[in-house]
Amino acid sequence: MNNQYNWNLEVLLNGKSLADNFTELKQLSEQEKALYDGGACFQTKAKFTEFLQLQEKIEVLENRYSNFLSNKHAENSLDKTINDALFQYEMFKSEHALVFVDFEKNLFKHEKVIRAYLQDPALKQYQRDFELVWRNKKHQIDPASQKLLAQISPAWNQADKIFNVLSTADLNLQPVVYKGKTYVINAVSDYQSLLENKDRGLREAAYKVWLEIYWPTRNTLSVSLVENYIQLETFAKLKKHPNYIAKTAFDDEIDVAFIDFVYEQVASFAPTFKAFQSLRKQIYKHVLKLDKAQPWDLSVPLFKASGDYTIEQAQTDALKILAPMGSEYLEVVKEAFRERWISWLPDKNKYTGAYSISNVKGLDHYFILMNFDKTRASLNTLVHELGHSVHSWYASKYQTQNLDPTIFYAEIASICNELLLCYHDIINYENRNPQQLIRSLMEQISHFFGATTRQLMFSQFEQDTLKLIQQNQKPDFKTLVEIYGKTAIKYQAANADAITKKLKQTKYQKSLAYITSIPHFYAGNFYVYKYAIGQVVGTLVGKKLSAGDSNMLAAYKRFLSSGSTLPPLETIKLLGIDLTQPEPWQEAHAELKRWIKLVQTAFKQLQHKKR
């Protein structure tokens, strides 16, 4: 791979070998154990300060080492040297945890004296870290149970491991046969490629085979998912929480009722979702010259640009699109390009998605992995991931602790950049190029509903399934599909009677079987509803920044710079947005409706043009 288009991960090793970094990490770890000495480090302020400073040194080294390993693994999942190093690192972490099994107990025991130490301005930066531990005081597990849990931790998440095999190696990836030609399928994404093909017959054939992917393993996947939820419920109760969702809400420093509030706000988008789906089908019917748009027609790219889109073009366009962020922000983006923060190109055994790294304390390169496909879609991916990386840059510049944003609001920075791309397109294409305006807005509207309506349907499915488990029921595949199917009534304005009838049909059940294969459900964190938060806030911020709102720009820089130093909803309030009130949700909904009207106008222009 051309070094120009590959990331410079070697900077993470500080000029040393991988083995030398691991040796240093183990040596520092031994020093940490000796200094900790069963809680002796809390007995004097001097020892306490020395312990914190050593922990920081270890954290920085560990961030560098673990990021190097995880990124090299993403670069080539079959690299034996890296896989061996990852295994050794995981074993080291597990053994290390046993020494600190009573760490929280000692923090609670020495809370009064630690609070006194933290009055020193030099130590004030650590205050939030300790407060987050102390608020868990009533949820602590006794030391004996904690030690037992640490010892059996390798046996945890067996349902997750079974799911990973079922959803990868054991997937029913059947070839697509069409007009005597066999299309070999190596990954689920291969079906998507065929669904984007110009040949409608091939698309239909691919769609029908795609429906069968999860059908043979539907019952096993269902058992795996339910057992995963039972484990999560059990661990939550072990920590004296009412249930798994309540535990996640506690960890996020929110009232559990806020989750239901989000459900109701997104449910109010349902009529707009239904109207957009109708408009979308009309557009596909017109552009593709169809009698009726079918499910296998709706993935075909509309109005694709001709010719290859280059990485250099993407870099130039990204700088134009992100101009409303100001000169400092743009300089960071230029640094990302110049200092090779980005792994650009697809490669054999490379992770197929895109991400920006986390655990960034002590780093000065905030790496991005992507798979540039020579289309403008990669520009959207680029600005999205740059949003995360520049967020890391700002947090690192202004905070010494609590740098990484929580998943609760992490997507705001990336969605905001996507919106700047959308508004850039509106300015360039409105009343000039209806085809490209439709393409851009259709993508953005679909992303909006994907992050709100679709993710809330997933989240509602999780909540409803967990309620049955809390009632000592074990839902089977049929029950899970019924739960998911009925979420369309609330979030997509689907007809209740029609859904009830369709749920009795095998074909419809097959189309919903993927609900048992969502990896997010195994994360151990009830979080998919949070995508709606990122989308709604990102929309409001992006709209104002695009319009040149200097007050919002200043607020946005404060938001980026805050890291995770505040509770999540308080962090979002730095933007002047209170998500516990309906107004922000209504404002985002109004903007969504404005986009749809722009699409309707452009579609009329397109129809008039072709007469």
Curated annotation (Swiss-Prot):
Record keywords, A-Z: Hydrolase, Metal-binding, Metalloprotease, Protease, Zinc
Concerning PROSITE patterns, the annotation shows: ZINC_PROTEASE
Q: Does the keyword Protease apply?
A: yes
InterPro entries linked: OligopepF_N_dom (IPR013647), OligoPept_F_C (IPR042088), Pept_M3A_M3B_dom (IPR001567), Peptidase_M3B (IPR004438)
For the biological process aspect of GO, one term held by this record is:
proteolysis
Q: How is the cofactor bound?
A: Binds 1 zinc ion.
Residues reported to bind Zn(2+)? 384, 388, 391
| EC number(s) given by UniProt | 3.4.24.-
Q: What class of enzyme is it?
A: hydrolase
- KW Ribosomal protein (keyword) present: no
Coiled coil region boundaries: none
Q: Which GO terms describe its molecular function?
A: metal ion binding; metalloendopeptidase activity
Q: Which cofactor does it need?
A: Zn(2+)
Q: Name one Pfam family in it.
A: Peptidase_M3
Name the family the entry cites: Belongs to the peptidase M3B family.
What protein am I looking at? Answer: Oligoendopeptidase F homolog
Organism whose genome encodes this protein: Mycoplasma pneumoniae (strain ATCC 29342 / M129 / Subtype 1)
